[in-house]
């Protein structure tokens, strides 16, 4: 009888542990930054900086200035200042070809655009109008519904 109870307890434990889900990787996991550590350093220095339209300092920054400064820091590559100019300075790629450093473009309204830098694992860093400099998920319903194009800056 004791062996039967032990078997049942072990079976239940194995069943429960096999069905548990592991949480999504945290934003700062090593895998997120595997291709360019400078992006991680840059993000750490700018995290939580408030959004300010037209801003380009730690007092406040907009999305295109954030991308511009990140590229200069991490890739020593000068990008144009505006979202549409960054769009024009990059080449379209297929979603399946994405890699860290690609630019994600969103149409947030009929005439407004937003840009961020793809990291890995469905995540991108950007200057959010409501939350400042953060990492968001591309599969977030809001961002997924606003997604427009993914593009690559040729180095």
Question: What are the residue ranges of the model-derived segments?
Answer:
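Bacterial N-terminal signal peptides that target proteins for export
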Residues: 1-8
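Glycine- and charge-enriched low-complexity intrinsically disordered segments
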Residues: 143-155
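C-terminal motif of bacterial Sec signal peptides marking the signal peptidase cleavage site
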Residues: 15-18
